[in-house]
Amino acid sequence: METQRASLCLGRWSLWLLLLALVVPSASAQALSYREAVLRAVDRLNEQSSEANLYRLLELDQPPKADEDPGTPKPVSFTVKETVCPRPTRQPPELCDFKENGRVKQCVGTVTLDQIKDPLDITCNEVQGVRGGGLCYCRRRFCVCVGRG
């Protein structure tokens, strides 16, 4: 009788633990990868933009050193380029081709890898053209300019 009662109690605890595991998502399921967090920032940029076309990730700088806390803001630097897709279409930017001679923006700021917390602090500035119709790409304090003339 005592063994049967202990078995029933153990069964209930197992059921409770299983239900708890299903209801409470794990921390790893809530954490985004560095790239996913940046893509989310690009989506936010497109949502808040008043420009005609969507922007798509062109280049992503290396992620910062590993930090175990997904809620801690992480520095980010990336480049986006204008696509051929009009903003009102709501098409995923990853499916859009880059626009020939489209605008290029360098973006810096911070993101978190936590899906629940959503603080993004990103500033994007258009990469300025140079004489002859070329472009300058600046990364931190180093710029490379490619001109046509």
UniProtKB/Swiss-Prot annotation:
The modification Arginine amide is found at R148. GO terms for cellular component: extracellular space. Disulfide bonds join C85-C96, C107-C124, C136-C145, C138-C143. GO terms for molecular function: lipopolysaccharide binding. InterPro entries: Cathelicidin-like, Cathelicidin_CS, Cystatin_sf. The keyword Lyase does not apply. Its main location: secreted. Residues 30-130 form a propeptide. It is found in: Secreted. Residues 61-80 are annotated as: Disordered. PANTHER family: CATHELICIDIN (PTHR10206), CATHELICIDIN ANTIMICROBIAL PEPTIDE (PTHR10206:SF2). This is Protegrin-3. The gene is NPG3.
